[in-house]
Amino acid sequence: MNPLIQEITKSQLRSDIPSFRPGDSVRVHVRVVEGTRERIQLFEGVVIKRHGVGVSETYTVRKISSGVGVERTFPLHSPRVAKLEVTRHGRVRRAKLYYLRALRGKAARIKEARR
């Protein structure tokens, strides 16, 4: 890779991101701009996948809101994400937890890991 591109991407990487894996429950604090105002919106759910490497790395969080499953994908190093908190470490044996889309209620629970 071009050294100039490497230098630019290295400056864009965030260092305040906690380590998390698919199956972990996270709370994402997202900066939302509405007109001239900016506020923080929380999105709390289970990480169902991580994808990519470096600046372009993303993760998808799934939650159930009013009985409807909502998935939202965030860039890992985005300045729009104010804070990322890991609330629980889950124990799963897959990298992509797409099977959770078909499960409801207690069947969609994930065991807690001892980390």
Swiss-Prot record:
GO-annotated molecular function: structural constituent of ribosome
A GO BP annotation: translation
Classification via Gene3D superfamilies: 2.30.30.790
An annotated GO cellular component: cytosolic large ribosomal subunit
Top-level taxon of the source organism: Bacteria
Alphabetical list of InterPro entries matching this protein: Ribosomal_bL19 (IPR001857), Ribosomal_bL19_CS (IPR018257), Ribosomal_bL19_sf (IPR038657), Translation_prot_SH3-like_sf (IPR008991)
Pfam families per the UniProt record, alphabetical: Ribosomal_L19
Protein's UniProt keywords contain Ribonucleoprotein: yes
UniProt keyword annotations, A-Z: Ribonucleoprotein, Ribosomal protein
Family note: Belongs to the bacterial ribosomal protein bL19 family.
Functional description taken from the UniProt entry: This protein is located at the 30S-50S ribosomal subunit interface and may play a role in the structure and function of the aminoacyl-tRNA binding site.
This protein's name: Large ribosomal subunit protein bL19
Lineage of the species this protein comes from: Bacteria, Bacillati, Bacillota, Bacilli, Lactobacillales
